Every structure is written in structure tokens, then in C-alpha cells.
């Protein structure tokens, strides 16, 4: 196999100008997906065992990220992101 059990991959994802980290860990019969905030705190995580689970998990994680943005940012944060897109 390409990935060994226990291998962890990380990727920066950007949602509405805010950076988050996606951490994916291979387990014996599943893959663990965890989204972390800019300080490394877990926002949400799920276990995925097949491709159908993946699409559901991505929707759930995306909703968790939007909730985090709503609860942890203010209008000035959002305005700064709009300015930085320029």
C-alpha cells in the first residue's frame, strides 16, 4: 500500500479567506479526517470508511468550519480577508 497505517497527511484549506488545516490519518479500516483552526485546535473530526462516507463527511466538516467562522470572527476579520483578496 502507498500509505501505511498511522500515516498522517496535512493540507491547508481556505474557507472564505480563513485558513484551516485538514489532517488525515490512515487507520486499519478507515481514514480519520480532522479540521484544525489556526491555533491547531480541533474543530471537528470524522472517520470515513468508503467513498460514500467521504462526501457526507466533507459536507459535515464544511458546516463545522462555517459555524467556527460565525462564532470566532467578527466583521473586521471578514473585512480584512476581503481587503487581502485585492
Each language-model region and where it sits:
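Amphipathic, interaction-prone secondary-structure segments
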Residues: 4-36
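Mixed-charge, Lys/Arg-enriched low-complexity segments
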Residues: 2-3, 38-86
Amino acid at each position: 500500500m502507498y500509505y501505511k497505517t498511522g500515516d498522517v497527511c496535512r493540507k491547508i484549506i481556505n474557507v472564505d479567506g480563513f485558513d484551516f488545516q485538514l489532517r488525515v490519518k490512515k487507520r486499519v479500516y478507515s481514514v480519520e479526517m480532522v479540521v484544525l483552526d489556526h491555533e491547531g485546535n480541533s474543530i471537528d473530526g470524522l472517520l470515513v470508511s468508503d467513498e460514500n462516507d467521504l462526501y457526507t463527511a466533507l459536507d459535515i466538516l464544511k458546516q463545522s468550519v462555517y459555524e467556527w467562522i460565525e462564532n470566532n470572527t467578527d466583521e473586521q476579520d471578514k473585512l480584512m480577508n476581503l481587503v487581502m483578496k485585492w
